[in-house]
């Protein structure tokens, strides 16, 4: 192990049925990637990348790919890293298979500096450290029941002061470690591979600038799902809504029949949205409205919502409900003595972000993507669990652009928070799964397109 990571030295040897030096290297790579800050920033979402730190992460990955001998390694001005890996002997005519991971980490909590720890979980409550507010941060089976199945295992955790970045740096480490394995043993069966490491997934960019013609893949997989065995070919339909309020500010002592409080108007809209349709009250295939941010004062205010639903009809109904709520509040304010000469207090702008990729992946011609993943997991002793993803991946947009991409496990738990962790066994097993998967596609899986 790299001497820069002394916390990794005492982990000992791990023997899996496909184990190799390249497999054990996945842990070192993951820790190293986590230590490179790369949060995206919704405040500058019109720029790609939205934050310069993502370029640093892109440079690290591009350098690792070149060191392994990947072909056509490119790092462009938008922090997209792409590369190719040639097919093994005899698999040259198989369609090119893509793997796509994202370089950025979530922006909702602290993302720098990141201090990964490798800790043996012995059961019960495991203290990670203290948060930035001084409060103790711990993993607890009361909130993470899966810990009961991880007793005696090594976990990569935070120190309580930031997220970890397993979403999606665990996936980046897995893919690079797969290539290390193929470089070490070129006879491992695999088709030609196209690799894409992209920015700004966490703010809904959706790999929009990825050149699919240059990538040259017939189909592929994103690696951005949760615990080992998770497989997603359903995502939410997603939209974002921005509601702006224009009020009239006057001295509170003379406000009667004159003042129009922009912030109060936004609160009235929020009251009209069913309370049970918020993220904290929904699960599985239940959609929601999420008030992501609200800011402003009496004169001007703004509320940002995201709208999510797996069902297309319900999704459209949710957008209509929000528009109706805005119209109702405008009508209510128009009847007040303080009405602004017929000018509405509120305006709303709704933009679709991505669609449920099941519309593409569930087509008969793409069914092999589901079955091949199931076979690859099974070859490594893992039962695949197809779950509707309560979120989205770059694969959602890529699928509708002509590159069908369901989603494999990245093996992170508690994403986007200071209790995020990744079990080392899951991390290493997924390298085995990826090897099994490329082997399946090296069998000459021909698809009519």
What is the meaning of each model-derived region?
Residues 23-51, 156-157, 249, 356, ...:
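N-terminal capping segment at the start of a domain
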Residues 147-236, 278-292, 296, 303-310, ...:
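Acidic/histidine-rich catalytic neighborhood of metal-dependent amide-processing enzymes
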Residues 134-154, 232-244, 374-375, 406:
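Acidic-glycine-rich active-site phosphate/pyrophosphate-binding loop
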Residues 8, 263-449:
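Metal-dependent amide/peptide-bond hydrolase catalytic core
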Residues 45-94, 98-100, 104:
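A non-catalytic alpha/beta surface segment that caps or lines the substrate-entry region
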Residues 147-162, 246-250, 380, 412-416:
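Glycine/charged-rich beta-loop-alpha catalytic/anionic-binding loops adjacent to active sites
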Residues 91-192, 197:
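Active-site metal-coordination/substrate-binding segment of hydrolases
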Residues 92-93, 253, 312-317:
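Short, conserved charged micro-motifs
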